[in-house]
């Protein structure tokens, strides 16, 4: 008799919990149609920005590659030639790659950059069909439209 009463009470407790949660709004989103609004400081896709005059901000100092804990960044610096200037510094990044498969989105590269060349946006849809497509080259990282990265690309340092 005692175990039967205990079983009924336990079932009633479980039923009460189920009924409580049955009428709450769901926390899931229908992803492709509805996208989650991310916090302002969330970190996603990387961008390389340019100055207002069109020159690259990256001076090829390699600080982003040095500070990256995942070693996901490769920078090959080259000297600016007098007739063919790429950046305001003495050097520029002739080759700049980020392996997005290795990146942990820590933001250290953004903090270490002395010119603010590399910024992390809040775009999180980074899927690709091949591993090679996940290695972002300089052309893919260069910001095409101002403000796409979530930061003001015209800010002067």
UniProtKB/Swiss-Prot annotation:
Compartments (UniProt record): Cell inner membrane
The name this protein goes by in its record: NADH-quinone oxidoreductase subunit I
Disulfides per UniProt: none
The keyword Repeat is assigned to this record: yes
GO biological process: aerobic respiration
Database matches in Pfam families: Fer4_7
Reactions listed under catalytic activity: a quinone + NADH + 5 H(+)(in) = a quinol + NAD(+) + 4 H(+)(out)
Gene Ontology molecular function: 4 iron, 4 sulfur cluster binding; iron ion binding; NADH:ubiquinone reductase (non-electrogenic) activity; quinone binding
EC number(s) given by UniProt: 7.1.1.-
Record flagged with keyword Chaperone: no
Residues annotated as binding [4Fe-4S] cluster 2: 68, 103, 106, 109
Domain 4Fe-4S ferredoxin-type: start-end pairs: 47-78, 94-123
Known cofactor(s): [4Fe-4S] cluster
Gene3D superfamilies: 3.30.70.3270
Enzyme class: translocase
Organism encoding this protein: Protochlamydia amoebophila (strain UWE25)
Membrane topology annotation: Peripheral membrane protein
InterPro entries: 4Fe4S_Fe-S-bd, 4Fe4S_Fe_S_CS, NADH_quinone_OxRdtase_chainI
Assigned GO CC terms: plasma membrane
Residues that hold [4Fe-4S] cluster 1 according to the record: 58, 61, 64, 113
Binding note for cofactor: Binds 2 [4Fe-4S] clusters per subunit.
UniProt keyword annotations, A-Z: 4Fe-4S, Cell inner membrane, Cell membrane, Iron, Iron-sulfur, Membrane, Metal-binding, NAD, Quinone, Repeat, Translocase, Ubiquinone
Job description of the protein: NDH-1 shuttles electrons from NADH, via FMN and iron-sulfur (Fe-S) centers, to quinones in the respiratory chain. The immediate electron acceptor for the enzyme in this species is believed to be ubiquinone. Couples the redox reaction to proton translocation (for every two electrons transferred, four hydrogen ions are translocated across the cytoplasmic membrane), and thus conserves the redox energy in a proton gradient.
């Amino acid at each position: 008799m005692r175990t039967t009463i205990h079983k009924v009470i336990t079932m009633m407790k479980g039923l009460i919990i189920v009924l409580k949660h049955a009428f709450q709004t769901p926390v899931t989103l229908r992803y492709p149609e509805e996208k989650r609004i991310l916090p302002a400081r969330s970190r996603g896709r990387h961008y390389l920005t340019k100055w207002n005059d069109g020159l690259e901000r990256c001076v090829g100092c390699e600080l982003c590659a040095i500070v990256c804990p995942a070693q996901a960044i490769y920078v090959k610096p080259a000297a600016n030639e007098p007739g063919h200037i790429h950046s305001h510094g003495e050097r520029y990044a002739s080759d700049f790659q980020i392996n997005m498969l290795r990146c942990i989105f820590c933001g250290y590269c953004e903090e270490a950059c002395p010119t603010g060349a590399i910024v992390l946006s809040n775009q999180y849809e980074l899927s690709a069909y091949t591993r090679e497509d996940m290695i972002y080259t300089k052309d893919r990282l260069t910001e095409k439209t101002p403000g796409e990265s979530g930061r003001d690309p015209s800010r002067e340092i």
